Structures are given as structure tokens and as C-alpha cells.
């Protein structure tokens, strides 16, 4: 019985860790983007290739992190897809000529640098990453 209780406690702790870690992802944008917040549905539309602007009219270009923990957390928290399903969706859009695959960058610092220097760029990074020169968007 003690083993079952301990297993249940460890499983619950793991789930709490996943929820807490999702909050560790920041959505960032170039300062040229007018918005200060973005809805989860707008974010999903932009990062799945279904929109090129936010509801306020700001044109945006999504920038992706290459596979890793922050990328997986972003997809899980805001897109609701696994990396495999997410990339399959983009490949379908690219193959049909409806969109071009977003730029994939290696590491949070590269995303911050690219977003800071490219009008309309929007990306995501770890909350712990220094992010001078970019705007943090609140996700509602």
C-alpha cells in the first residue's frame, strides 16, 4: 500500500512540475509590434501558419527554437501539439504552397537577437533568459 501511495505522490509531483514549467516560457516580440498582449488563440494561429498578423493589425513573423525543452513546453502550453504533429502541419502548408517554414534558431540567445533586430518577429524563450531589446507579450 505504501508503494502505491508513494507512486501516486511522485506522479502528482511530476504533473505539478510540468504545469509550473509551462509558465517558464516567455513570448517575445520585436518592439515594432504594437501589441503588449496576445491571446492564446492568436498565438496558435500565428505559430501554425494560419495568420500573419495579430488582432491589433500587427504583422508578425514566427521564429522557432530548435527542438528542446522550451520548444516542447511552448508547443504543449500554447499550440496543443507534439513537435512531430506541429512540424507535419507546417510541412503540409509548405508543400501546398500556402506558407514558408518559419526560421528555426539554435538557443534562446539567438531567438532574442533575431527578434530584437527584425521588425515583426515574434518568438519564445525560457523565462530565465536575458531579453533586453525585445518586448515581452502577456498571453491571455
Feature-to-residue mapping (PLM):
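Bacterial N-terminal signal peptides that target proteins for export
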Residues: 1-8
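Cleavable N-terminal signal peptides
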Residues: 8-11, 21
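Residue-level detector of alpha-helix boundary/anchor positions
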Residues: 10-13, 117
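Sec/Tat signal peptide C-region and signal peptidase I cleavage site
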Residues: 15-23
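Exported/periplasmic ABC-transporter solute-binding proteins
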Residues: 24-140
Amino acid at each position: 500500500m505504501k508503494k502505491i501511495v508513494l507512486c501516486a505522490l511522485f506522479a502528482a509531483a511530476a504533473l505539478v512540475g510540468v504545469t509550473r514549467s509551462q509558465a517558464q516560457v516567455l513570448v517575445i516580440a520585436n518592439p515594432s509590434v504594437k501589441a503588449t498582449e496576445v491571446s492564446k488563440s492568436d498565438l496558435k494561429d500565428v505559430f501554425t501558419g494560419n495568420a500573419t498578423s495579430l488582432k491589433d493589425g500587427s504583422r508578425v513573423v514566427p521564429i522557432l527554437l530548435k527542438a528542446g525543452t522550451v520548444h516542447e513546453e511552448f508547443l504543449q502550453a500554447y499550440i496543443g501539439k507534439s513537435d512531430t504533429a506541429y512540424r507535419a502541419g507546417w510541412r503540409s502548408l509548405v508543400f501546398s504552397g500556402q506558407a514558408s517554414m518559419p526560421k528555426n534558431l539554435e538557443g534562446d540567445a539567438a531567438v532574442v537577437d533575431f527578434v530584437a533586430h527584425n521588425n515583426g518577429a515574434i518568438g519564445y524563450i525560457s523565462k530565465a533568459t536575458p531579453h533586453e531589446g525585445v518586448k515581452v507579450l502577456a498571453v491571455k
